[in-house]
């Protein structure tokens, strides 16, 4: 059987095994994935974070699912095609923000699910709407703020569905 990996990318102000990542890692393991989290602390430049993720994933053989929160969402999107990711799951992704390098127009070639809080005052939820429209991604807008901590249980269910759907025929994401 092919090895299956979920690789988490945390946000700018958090760490590799924060509350959201730890809770989603449990879901990943229950679905037969190995869970990994890249430590970006001390790396401010998004391009360096992308390079760090690509380097980390070179050591992993098998199917790869990327999960990113905030700036980690940007890193996951920017890396997905380079790593031939099977899918990406994004939480309040820092997309289309001033100061971040622009993403290539056809950057994504795998299924994506985006979760964002209506009350996010760090990254406007409209940025996730724009991304979901551009890439025909599933989008879940929740009653929450940027950290989404009050919705972790819901996000766990959404992530579980996302992982299960990856094993279904392409219809699951159409």
Locate the predicted segments by residue.
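Short, surface-exposed "cap/lid" segments of acyl-processing enzymes
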Residues: 1-44
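Acidic catalytic loop of the alpha/beta-hydrolase fold
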Residues: 14-15, 97, 118-123, 146-147
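Post-His helix in hydrolase/transferase enzymes
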Residues: 22, 126-127, 149-165
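Catalytic histidine neighborhood in serine/cysteine hydrolases
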Residues: 32, 133-150
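Gly/Ala-rich beta-loop-alpha elbow adjacent to hydrolase catalytic centers
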Residues: 67-77
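A conserved short beta-strand
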Residues: 84-96
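Short beta-strand/loop motif that positions the catalytic acidic residue
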Residues: 107-109, 114-116, 120
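Conserved loop-alpha-helix segment in the C-terminal half of the alpha/beta-hydrolase fold
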Residues: 118-137
């Amino acid at each position: 059987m092919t090895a299956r990996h979920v690789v988490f990318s945390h946000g700018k102000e958090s760490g590799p095994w924060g509350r959201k990542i730890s809770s989603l890692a449990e879901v990943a393991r229950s679905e037969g994935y190995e869970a990994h989290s890249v430590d970006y602390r001390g790396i401010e430049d998004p391009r360096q974070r992308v390079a760090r993720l690509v380097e980390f994933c070179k050591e992993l053989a098998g199917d790869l699912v990327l999960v990113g929160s905030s700036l980690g969402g940007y890193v996951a999107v920017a890396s997905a095609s380079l790593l031939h990711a099977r899918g990406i799951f994004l939480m309040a992704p820092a997309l289309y923000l001033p100061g971040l390098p622009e993403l290539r127009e056809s950057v994504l070639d795998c299924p994506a699910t985006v979760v964002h809080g209506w009350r996010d005052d760090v990254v406007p939820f409209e940025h996730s709407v724009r991304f979901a429209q551009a890439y025909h991604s599933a989008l879940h807008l929740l009653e929450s703020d940027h950290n989404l901590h009050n919705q972790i249980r819901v996000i766990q269910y959404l992530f579980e569905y996302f992982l299960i759907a990856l094993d279904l025929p392409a219809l699951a994401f159409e």
